[in-house]
Amino acid sequence: MRKMLSVILLIVICLSAAHCATAENIRVTVVPPSCTEAGYTLYESIESGITTVHDEVPATGHQFGEWQEDPRSGGSQRVCKVCGYAEARSSKPISSFPIVYLNGNTAGISKSERVTLEFAFESEETSFSCYAYTTWQGHQTLNYPKKNYTIRLYDDEEISHKHKLSFNRWQYEHKYVLKANYRDISAVRNLIAADIWADMASARPHLYPKLLKTSHYGAVDGFPVAVYLNDEFHGLYNMNLHIDDDLYRMTDQYDAVMIANSSEPEETRFFSPALFIDEKDAWEVEYCGTGNDNQWAKDKLNELIGFVINSSDEEFRRDLGAYLDVNGAIDYLIFIYITGLDNNAAKDLVLLKYQGSDVWIPTVYDMERAFGLARDGEAYVAANEFLPTENNGVWDSNTNSLLWDRLLQNYTDEIRMRYRRLRTGILTTDALTERVREAISEIPPQYYNMDMETYPRCLLAELPEEQMTDYIQSRLPLLDMALLGNLVIEDGDSMEDSY
């Protein structure tokens, strides 16, 4: 365990640029970095109890010795000279495609009941073994035969020491989701959409500083894997980072994550306040720095919803930025238009709030229906569905959401300018179709076949790669016309104006 150094300091807090007032006692706790966890300085007000984290120092990383043969596994291992963590290397032939092996008794597993399984990961880049504290994950997806899993990795079967990893550009983490993508036989729609969001966010002015430190600019991050359960093929999955405080680099007491669970209730469509009756209600507190004492976060969300409902157009345009990251909201609306994710106008909208700011930042989650997949996965959606419309200066976002209707009506010029900049830059038709081809080509065909044999479901007439590229090529000109009128966009166009 890392040593903590605590001292009491008297710090003068400057309340304005012109005056310095009120001094309060601050307890300062310095936590040095370890092999897998960042160091930081924790400031706690003795009077108010409010804590903040500053001066973060990256984890040092393991300092491994030489690889040694391990008679127990038949492979080899190397041990960190600092913390004693042992990294294993299998003697099995290494697959060019990542494989996850789970072994153990899964009887009784559910969303609330966990089981401990042996876990092994194999790829060309890395291999390791440990234990996985495993549950089912999701809401509606629990009804499908192919389940999502939340896995928490530990060094020991007693789950007393976290097994934190740093691979695939990720920080040291131990919580992951094995996403089944039951409706999406391509297994890549969610990943492609997340990459698009990350590209948009990276090109956004004034991105919140902590999002710059995340692996994917606030989007879910992952990659395809083949999963074997007790030595039998269990399915083609995505191994994603878990949606929590670590994903969003939240370290302070008054940080929070909200997620919309459904597109049906008026609360997630910003027509009425959030009620928070239970975890299956419209809005869910996915994370709160103050734990179950989260009423303040619920109140902050309802302040945003109330503003959207009650403000005049003049107030909405002038003051929205006090409640919601406007640039992020503009990108979110453009994103769901580009990808055709009409359901994500409400459901799976994620809102982030960091301590020191009252502004909610929108980000994306669960995008396996991107590029024209119907909600049940049994059909494809036409490219001309879910487009904004304008009639005599009055815009309809066609999202059935008061937030997006009002944003499109009151920030029309900013949305159109940002859209054109993206379409003539990182979101050209060629760039998007190439993403699709590359993502599908990375998965060996035999795993697609094995997944369909394991989970027989509707075989659509058009193959996923062909359908997605056709959808993009057909939809984008329609969206260009809907948002920009007769201004034709061609690959290679450029635009200098910023939004």
Question: At which residue positions do the language-model features occur?
Answer:
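Gram-positive cell-envelope targeting signals
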Residues: 1-24, 62, 83, 499
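Thrombospondin type-1
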Residues: 20-90
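Conserved NTP-binding catalytic cores of kinases and kinase-like/nucleotidyltransferase enzymes
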Residues: 82-84, 89-195, 499
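Middle-to-C-terminal accessory/interaction subdomains
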Residues: 130, 140, 144-145, 295-345, ...
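Structural recognition of the beta-strand scaffold that forms the well-ordered cores
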Residues: 149-152, 175-180, 187, 225-228, ...
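Internal "kinase-insert"/substrate-recognition segments embedded within catalytic cores
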Residues: 157-159, 164-166, 171-183, 204, ...
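Short, solvent-exposed loop/turn and secondary-structure capping segments
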Residues: 162-165, 189-191, 237-239, 246-253, ...
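A conserved helix-loop-beta module that forms one wall/lid of the active-site cleft
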Residues: 185-226
